[in-house]
Design a protein with these regions (language model features):
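Short amphipathic alpha-helix that is part of the acyltransferase structural core
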Residues: 1-34, 129, 138-167
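Active-site rim helix/loop that mediates acceptor-substrate recognition in acyltransferases
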Residues: 27-50, 161-193
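Conserved donor-binding loop and adjoining core beta-sheet/short helix segment
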Residues: 30-89, 194-206, 212
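Acyl-donor-binding surface of acyltransferase catalytic domains
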Residues: 70, 78-142, 265-267
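Conserved acetyl-CoA-binding loop-helix of GNAT-fold acetyltransferases
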Residues: 83-96, 210, 216-229, 248-253
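Conserved hydrophobic beta-strand within the GNAT/NAT acetyltransferase core sheet
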Residues: 103-107, 205, 236-240
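Conserved active-site alpha-helix within GNAT-family acetyltransferase domains
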Residues: 109-127, 221, 243-260
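C-terminal "cap" of GNAT-fold acetyltransferases
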Residues: 127-148, 239-245, 258-271
Length: 271
């Protein structure tokens, strides 16, 4: 049975037991800040919904979901269960309660139960993402081709931006409290960009892109080096497609180290 919850405080032993299990931990709850934001304090945010699944009086699953009705969008922020029936109950509820919504699910590659439930509903799956953490980067060398975003480059930035994701170029520019944008400029034109989160305990180069004709000129490294410098002294991590060996080598050259236990997969499902 699925129930909507007003809080998860009564279920802390269940939460900590799940997070200690490498086969069932949730990468969206990898840090204390994420644990509070996505689950423990989710009841304080009216855009978040908390659900529990129960077998008799026994808790079998806990879930936190971000719901944005004005955008017809939702995202699973936390999913903790060892039972396939719990994931099926959650997905069935979401399909009934939010028909037509676009839903994203971020989860561990080891979470076969959720993966199977999504595959049964014909979800689309992104490649596995490798988690990497910045350790001790080399000294910063400024590059005159890299600068902070200014509105004069708005049209070029938006034209270049990868919009096959929730954080489109328009949304990034509108979220000035979440992102800062770095641009790589060649011949007065935008040749690349990096969307960098900030104001967090740990920030992330969320999207790094260099146009094809400008590649192999050090622009990706220059953008990332500038992002690291502007982020100091805050911690930094990122995710990259596991199959993208060139990008992983670039990040490793700046002393990002891999942490495979925090890898994830994103699935997309039209409810």
């Amino acid at each position: 049975m699925l129930k909507e919850l007003s809080s998860v405080q009564a279920y802390l032993p269940f939460i900590h037991a799940m997070l200690a299990d490498p086969d069932f931990r949730d990468p969206m709850l990898a840090t204390p800040a994420q644990l509070h934001q996505h689950l423990l304090d989710a009841h304080e945010d009216p855009a978040k919904r908390l659900f529990g699944t129960f077998d008799g009086g026994t808790l079998t699953g806990l879930f936190s979901v971000l719901v944005l009705p004005e955008e017809g969008y939702l995202q699973l922020l936390a999913g903790l269960s060892r039972q396939a029936a719990a994931y099926d109950a959650l997905l069935s509820h979401l399909q009934a309660a939010y028909p037509g919504y676009q839903a994203d699910f971020v989860y561990s590659p080891r979470s076969r139960l959720l993966h199977t439930a999504l595959a049964d509903r014909h979800a689309a799956f992104d490649p596995e993402q490798q988690k990497m953490f910045l350790r001790s980067p080399p000294p910063y060398v400024p590059d005159s081709r890299v600068q902070l975003y200014t509105p004069v480059f708005r049209a070029q930035y938006l034209a270049l931006h990868d919009d096959d994701r929730y954080w489109t170029g328009e949304r990034v520019l509108a979220a000035q409290d979440t992102f800062r944008v770095l641009l790589a400029i060649e011949d007065d034109a935008v040749a690349g960009y990096l969307d960098l989160t900030y104001r967090n305990a740990e920030n992330e180069p969320y999207d790094l892109f260099v146009r094809e004709k400008s590649r192999c000129r050090g622009l990706g490294r220059a953008l990332l080096s500038c992002a690291i410098e502007k982020n100091r002294p805050i911690a930094m991590s990122l995710r990259v497609d596991s199959v993208n060996l060139a990008a992983r080598r670039l990040y490793a050259s700046l002393d990002f180290v891999e942490k495979p236990e925090e890898n994830n997969i994103t699935a997309h499902l039209k409810l």
